[in-house]
């Protein structure tokens, strides 16, 4: 009973901290002068990581098995993975924007796990025979870590596309404004006082320099995180194939979950290939990564919604 109470306490604490982190991010967007809030939000995600870690360990102790048995436990592990991904660059003193991505991802995942699922699913149950294997921890944990990494990388690529698209709109608007200026005597007089139109153009380039640096960082971290997720996915699929051979006598059965896992892995491989070709880097590779965002969620939730196939033990029903 004490473990159940402790689990509820840790769940509420972690959820509250993530909510505070998101509020902090909104404040930094409105008030740029409060620099310390950004660092505080990243520390809040680290505190969330330890809370969810305690929650999973507590559930592991009183259930007697690694907490990856059902959809609720996998969602909590996914939320834990989002927090874990943030910690690596943070402790290496790299400036990044992971907390902007991981905080909403973690709170949405945890909100759905705690509020979107029925309370019966929250109860830990005995492992079904197919899951009573030492491969459970290796296969499922690697796949969930890959989902978290690939989702973060995809969101970073989506952010890159949005910023680039807005930049192109601003440049088009600025060009159209320049075409109107020569017809206005007042504007020509103003430009003469400023000595040249080039000065205004330089100001625009200076204003967009920070945006350029941001897109470069987003592209860099998106590539690194997706590469990490691709590695986890490869390990997870290989370990799952070995486990399937032991449990069902075949390495691959083209189960719906296996099929979508293969599609997810293929998209990640295509993205990695586009990064090796300089002509395909930037926007093209970001579009491929953005496609992976939808495919990953189909892979993760698709079988659970349908409730069919060899992996249907984790379905909503």
Swiss-Prot record:
Chief location category: plastid
Membrane topology: Multi-pass membrane protein
Classification via Pfam families: Cytochrom_C_asm (PF01578)
Sequence intervals crossing the membrane: 13-35, 44-64, 71-91, 143-163, 171-191, 225-245, 286-306
Cellular-component GO terms for this entry: chloroplast thylakoid membrane; plasma membrane
Subcellular location: Plastid, Chloroplast thylakoid membrane
Single GO MF descriptor: heme binding
UniProt-listed GO biological process terms: cytochrome complex assembly
Keywords annotated in UniProt: Chloroplast, Cytochrome c-type biogenesis, Membrane, Plastid, Thylakoid, Transmembrane, Transmembrane helix
Similarity remark: Belongs to the CcmF/CycK/Ccl1/NrfE/CcsA family.
Quaternary organization: May interact with Ccs1.
Function noted in UniProt: Required during biogenesis of c-type cytochromes (cytochrome c6 and cytochrome f) at the step of heme attachment.
Name recorded for this polypeptide: Cytochrome c biogenesis protein CcsA
UniProt gene name: ccsA
């Amino acid at each position: 009973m004490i473990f159940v109470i402790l689990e509820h306490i840790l769940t509420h604490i972690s959820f509250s901290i993530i909510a505070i982190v998101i509020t902090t991010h909104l404040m930094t967007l409105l008030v740029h002068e409060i620099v310390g809030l950004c660092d505080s939000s990243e520390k809040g995600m680290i505190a969330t990581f330890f809370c969810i870690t305690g929650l999973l360990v507590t559930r592991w102790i009183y259930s007697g098995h690694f907490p990856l048995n059902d959809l609720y436990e996998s969602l909590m592990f996914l939320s834990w993975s989002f927090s874990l991904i943030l910690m690596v660059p943070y402790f290496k003193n790299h400036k990044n924007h992971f907390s902007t991505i991981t905080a909403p991802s973690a709170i949405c995942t945890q909100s759905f796990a705690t509020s979107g699922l029925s309370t019966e699913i929250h109860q830990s149950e005995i492992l079904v025979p197919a899951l009573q294997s030492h491969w459970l921890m290796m296969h499922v944990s690697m796949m969930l870590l890959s989902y978290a990494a690939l989702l973060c990388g995809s969101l970073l690529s989506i952010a890159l596309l949005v910023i680039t698209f807005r930049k192109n709109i601003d440049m088009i608007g600025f060009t159209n404004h320049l075409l109107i200026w020569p017809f206005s005597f007042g504007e020509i007089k103003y430009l003469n006082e400023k000595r040249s139109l080039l000065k205004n153009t330089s100001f625009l380039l200076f204003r967009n320099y920070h945006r350029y640096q941001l897109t470069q960082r987003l592209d860099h971290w998106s590539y690194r995180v997706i590469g990490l997720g691709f590695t986890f996915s490869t390990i997870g699929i290989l370990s799952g194939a070995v486990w399937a051979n032991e449990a069902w006598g075949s390495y691959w059965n083209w189960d719906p979950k296996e099929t979508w896992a293969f599609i997810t892995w293929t998209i990640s491989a295509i993205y990695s290939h586009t990064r090796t070709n300089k002509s395909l880097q930037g926007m093209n590779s970001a579009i491929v990564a953005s496609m992976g965002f939808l495919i990953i969620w189909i892979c993760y939730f698709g079988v659970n919604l349908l409730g069919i196939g060899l992996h249907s033990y984790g379905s909503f029903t």
